[in-house]
């Protein structure tokens, strides 16, 4: 919820709402009105997830990650195909947009840029077939994106690459990105992304958050129990 809160407001939950308790609570209410969070303290089958989304008449559904779903047969390959087919039917019959997040296979996680390349030693973005389970996910999906970040690059670690690998419906203007020309999203202050220097959500933010920055050393009750793991610690010289 912390990161969703930040991107919802374009401000830092841990720094910009220390005195604006009303704005803080209003934002929490907005988020809980728009999102239903499925508890992560147990595992679900794909059918159970779809039933939950149908129960709440959701406009959209995110399954993250796919490998967290329980299996119901010994033939995982065929079950994956069946699951993808069931998700497509669910989308068509309920008009629910569904996103499925999946990880790379192990070999793809070893695929780095070669010597003398400008990104030498950094991980390459995944292809469609590099998904756990293989090409079948791209085959069954209407659209397929590879989201990549070179987390160990000294300058580009905060830039997310969005490679649009497949777009089924192109007649309305959609298309894939060109090879090696992804959409670049620059991460700023843990609460915003910009594309080509522009924040596409700039006009959607509510006027909430502290206006007076002199109180940044203060902590209100709702922030005292917040996890400090949401943001990186200050840099130091220790090797660990």
Enumerate the predicted regions with their spans.
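Short acidic/His/Gly/Ser-rich catalytic and metal-binding motifs that mark active-site loops
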Residues: 1-2, 69-72, 107-112
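Active-site-proximal loop/turn and secondary-structure-junction residues that shape catalytic pockets
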Residues: 6, 43, 67, 104-105
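Helical mechanochemical/support elements of P-loop NTPase systems and associated helical scaffolds
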Residues: 20-27, 42-48, 76-86, 127-133, ...
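Phosphate-binding/switch loop-helix module in NTP-utilizing enzymes
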Residues: 36-93
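Structural recognition of the conserved hydrophobic beta-strand(s) that form the central parallel beta-sheet
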Residues: 62-63, 96-103
């Amino acid at each position: 919820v912390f990161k969703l809160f930040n991107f919802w407001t374009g401000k830092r939950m841990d720094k910009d709402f220390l005195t604006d308790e009303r704005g803080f609570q209003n934002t929490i209410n907005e988020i809980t009105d728009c999102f239903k969070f499925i508890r992560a303290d147990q595992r679900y089958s794909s059918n159970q997830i779809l039933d939950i989304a149908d129960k709440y008449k959701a406009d959209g559904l995110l399954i993250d990650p796919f490998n967290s779903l329980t299996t119901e047969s010994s033939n995982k390959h065929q079950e994956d195909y069946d699951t993808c087919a069931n998700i497509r039917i669910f989308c068509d019959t309920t008009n629910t947009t569904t996103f499925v997040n999946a990880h790379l296979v192990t070999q793809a996680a070893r695929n780095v840029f070669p010597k003398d390349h400008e990104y030498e030693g950094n991980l390459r973005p995944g292809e469609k077939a590099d998904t756990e389970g293989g090409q079948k996910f791209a085959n069954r999906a209407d659209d397929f994106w590879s989201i990549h970040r070179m987390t160990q690059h000294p300058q580009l670690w905060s830039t997310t690459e969005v490679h649009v690998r497949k777009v089924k419906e192109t007649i309305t203007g959609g298309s894939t990105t060109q090879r090696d020309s992804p959409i670049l999203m620059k991460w700023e202050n843990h609460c915003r992304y910009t594309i080509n220097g522009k924040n596409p959500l700039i006009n959607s933010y509510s006027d909430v958050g502290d206006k007076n920055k002199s109180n940044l050393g203060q902590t209100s009750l709702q922030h005292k129990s917040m996890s400090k793991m949401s943001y990186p610690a200050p840099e130091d010289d220790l090797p660990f």
